[in-house]
Amino acid sequence: MPDNAIDTTVPPSGTGCTDCLAASGWWLHLRRCVTCGNIGCCDTSPSQHASRHAASTGHRLIRSFEPGEDWFWNFATEQFYDGPELAPPQHHPLDQPVPGPAGQVPPDWQRHLH
């Protein structure tokens, strides 16, 4: 994995998908850009903001932002990697619901997944 694409000093942009929160959307799982810290939603989520961020910025490396997960993914090679410790926090708050955010998830949320 190219280390120059990883900035271990940049904190996450927040505790939820930046774009979903701006548009009153919702997500299933969260991903963290390891270049700029942007938090986006996974490809199973309705809006797939993490991969859209990678495509629009060229920031191809992400890390899971889920509790108990520390894997990295490269959108260019479509491979998992191990990577360095990033600036805290390592995951969204433990009391944050999945899917989230609270109050935005429709009752039939499973039907909207990819």
Positions of predicted regions on the chain:
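Cys/His-rich, Zn2+-coordinating zinc-finger modules
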Residues: 2-5, 11-19, 23, 39-114
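Canonical RING-type zinc finger of E3 ubiquitin-protein ligases
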Residues: 25-34
